[in-house]
């Protein structure tokens, strides 16, 4: 991946889902810029070789691995407390981890898995790290969404797909939630020096869609490109001086783009925020 030669040697960057796909490429690119990179992954056995690979390839020894299961709210809380106790600053938070779940399933918290990981995981982790991000301002939050958000719908009577569930629709709904969350968070962070943006990485050749029906999976493979290419917009939003102070926007191919009309509904964004607070036990 071609990266701008920004020096991030004084910056701490956290990337979730950093052991494969876009997350791995993002972590690698930020390590090339001399950032302290904290890889947040679920499986230590799979992630340790990736951390070592990034260290070796970049010569940057400040690449750390921390373990967190983003489907578990208790584990997110444990991880956030551990991170805050071991790091005095956080300059960039990249919410990248995501899942596609073909058959409806529930987390240990009793929440539909796609919504739990792809939306509530972003929401809870970000809120728990917000004070540290504010203390480190100017800082940045980057939420990896998708153009699939345009196919999503936020049905407050069926947020968890109890009445009707499909793997792609659940994914699209969660990506719409990412955009609504980004816009609402940007409004709430106005004046704090913390910028928050979201992005469409492109359709990436990763394992994310392996749980979709075979015909759809085959079609997606025809239009995908590499994780390195897909990570470019995440890295751009995390590091580029060109977007200093830019907040509350959606990007694709490193350019601002307009999102769906549903994603720009401020009442939906506020309501989703309130419901998310209730579902994660955060104070309103």
Question: Each predicted region: which residue ranges?
Answer:
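Rossmann-fold NAD(P)H-dependent dehydrogenase/reductase core
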Residues: 1-205, 282-283
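A short, mixed-charge helix-start or loop-turn motif at secondary-structure junctions
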Residues: 16, 163, 167, 216-220, ...
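Intracellular terminal tails of multi-pass secondary transporters
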Residues: 270-284
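C-terminal helical subdomain
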Residues: 174, 198, 218-258, 264-270, ...
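A glycine/serine/threonine-rich, flexible loop-to-helix segment
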Residues: 204-219
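Short, flexible, mixed-charge acidic loops at enzyme active sites
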Residues: 154-159, 211-213, 251
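Hydrophobic alpha-helix feature that most strongly marks membrane-spanning transmembrane helices
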Residues: 190, 213, 239-242
């Amino acid at each position: 991946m071609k990266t701008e030669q920004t020096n991030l040697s004084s910056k701490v960057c956290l990337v979730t889902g950093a052991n494969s796909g876009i997350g791995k490429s993002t972590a690698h690119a930020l390590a090339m810029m001399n950032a302290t990179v904290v890889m947040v992954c679920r499986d230590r056995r799979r992630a340790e070789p990736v951390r070592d690979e990034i260290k070796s390839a970049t010569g940057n020894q400040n690449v750390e691995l921390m373990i967190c299961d983003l489907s578990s709210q208790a584990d997110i809380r444990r991880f956030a407390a551990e991170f805050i106790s071991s790091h005095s600053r956080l300059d960039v938070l990249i919410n990248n981890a995501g899942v596609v779940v073909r058959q409806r399933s529930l987390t240990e918290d009793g929440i539909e898995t796609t919504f739990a990981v792809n939306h509530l995981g972003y929401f809870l982790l970000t809120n728990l790290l917000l004070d540290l991000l504010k203390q480190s301002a100017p800082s940045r939050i980057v939420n990896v969404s998708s153009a699939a958000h345009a196919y999503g719908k936020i049905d407050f009577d069926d947020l968890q797909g109890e009445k009707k569930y499909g793997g792609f629709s659940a994914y699209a709904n969660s990506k719409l939630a990412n955009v609504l969350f980004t816009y609402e968070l940007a409004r709430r962070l106005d004046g704090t020096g913390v910028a928050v943006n979201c992005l469409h990485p492109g359709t990436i050749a990763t394992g994310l869609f392996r749980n979709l029906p075979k015909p759809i999976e085959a079609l997606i493979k025809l239009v995908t490109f590499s994780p390195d290419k897909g990570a470019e917009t995440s890295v751009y939003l995390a590091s580029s001086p060109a977007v200093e102070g830019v907040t509350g926007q959606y990007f694709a191919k490193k350019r601002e783009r307009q999102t769906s009309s549903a994603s720009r509904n401020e009442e939906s964004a506020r309501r989703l925020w309130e419901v998310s607070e209730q579902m994660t036990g955060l104070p309103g």
